[in-house]
């Protein structure tokens, strides 16, 4: 989807967002749009501006410049101030709700899963859902009617009366997701939703998120896992030093910025290959630790030369992926959190 297309069809629009803290520019002129049923992934190294961007989208941090607009596609299940549940959107909703003036109306259509659990440890799973629904002004009867469905969706029916401390990490993340769905949101904002989960728990979380996308829910996702981004996201927004440096589908970004074939060479003496005649067989190469990465349009001749001249070195031939893209655009140097 092209940027102009995205803006025309958008459920959610952020235009020219900027944020400064003193003399430091944290986010600079960032724009993006999210269509109904689309997952937009925001990726970037530590300090790229991801968290600040999400906080601005949630209305928790006021941008110094730019605008945020939400275009409801249906009436929500949450009553607005002075109105009943499931009422038709008014003319203002149809023309777009704006932050900060329409913050309450927008938040009623959002679901949020933060990186760290914010579940109430004193309440059971079912009670966590009930209490959270009350924050949206929902009637207890309406919330209780949704709880069995939400627990089933999260594969937690058998844990309805258990407290969060009795759950595994994966169960707590799924309960957080179920809680974010209490108000039947049109847009989910997920901050590192599978951090700390084992592979089985991650895959179950991905399955649930894909189900939501199939039902038309939109998702704004931040992640450090490139396999997660490639699996879930229809488009990616790449941030670095507060600026948008790329946007597009995962496959298009890979095709536009990378050579199709990657050969990893590792083992004793592999680093010396960076200055060997083999470098002429690659469009570019990178050295990271004891591994040399050759990026090439066709790896056949390179692989033959490696097998003949360096039989003791280990090689891995694979297609270019999002991790290669991420490292090319943002560098291999580790950045610590501020």
Language model features by range: what are they?
Residues 188-191:
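Catalytic Walker B motif of ABC-type/P-loop ATPase nucleotide-binding domains
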Residues 184:
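Conserved catalytic motifs of ABC-family nucleotide-binding domains
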Residues 66-76, 86, 90-99, 105-106:
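Conserved ABC transporter NBD signature motif
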């Amino acid at each position: 989807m092209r940027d102009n297309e995205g803006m025309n069809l958008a459920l959610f629009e952020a235009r020219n967002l900027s944020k400064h803290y003193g003399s430091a520019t944290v986010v600079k002129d960032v724009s993006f749009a999210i269509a109904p049923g689309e997952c937009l992934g925001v990726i970037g190294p530590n300090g790229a501006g991801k968290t600040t961007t999400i906080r601005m989208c949630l209305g928790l941090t006021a941008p110094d410049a730019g605008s945020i607009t939400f275009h409801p596609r249906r009436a929500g299940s949450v009553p607005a101030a002075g109105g009943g549940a499931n009422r038709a959107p008014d003319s203002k909703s149809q023309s777009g709700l704006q932050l900060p003036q329409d913050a309450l109306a927008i938040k009623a259509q959002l679901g949020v899963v933060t990186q760290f659990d914010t579940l109430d440890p004193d309440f059971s799973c079912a009670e966590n859902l009930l209490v959270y629904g009350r924050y949206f002004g929902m009637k207890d009867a309406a919330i209780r009617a949704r709880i069995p469905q939400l627990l089933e969706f999260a594969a937690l029916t058998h844990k309805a009366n258990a407290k969060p401390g009795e759950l595994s990490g994966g169960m707590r993340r799924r309960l957080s997701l179920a809680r974010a769905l209490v108000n039947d949101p049109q847009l989910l904002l997920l901050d590192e939703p599978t951090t700390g989960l084992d592979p089985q728990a991650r895959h179950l979380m991905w399955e649930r998120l894909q189900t939501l996308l199939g039902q038309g829910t939109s998702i704004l996702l931040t992640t450090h896992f490139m396999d997660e981004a490639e699996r879930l996201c229809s488009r990616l927004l790449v941030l670095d030093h507060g600026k948008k440096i790329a946007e597009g589908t995962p496959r298009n970004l890979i095709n536009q910025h990378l050579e199709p074939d990657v050969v990893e060479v590792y083992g004793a003496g592999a680093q010396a290959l960076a200055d060997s005649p083999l470098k002429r067989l690659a469009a570019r190469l990178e050295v990271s630790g004891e591994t040399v990465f050759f990026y090439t349009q066709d790896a056949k001749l390179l692989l033959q030369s490696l097998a003949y001249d360096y039989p003791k070195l280990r090689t891995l031939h694979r297609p270019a992926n999002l991790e290669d893209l991420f490292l090319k655009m943002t560098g291999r140097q580790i950045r610590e959190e501020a």
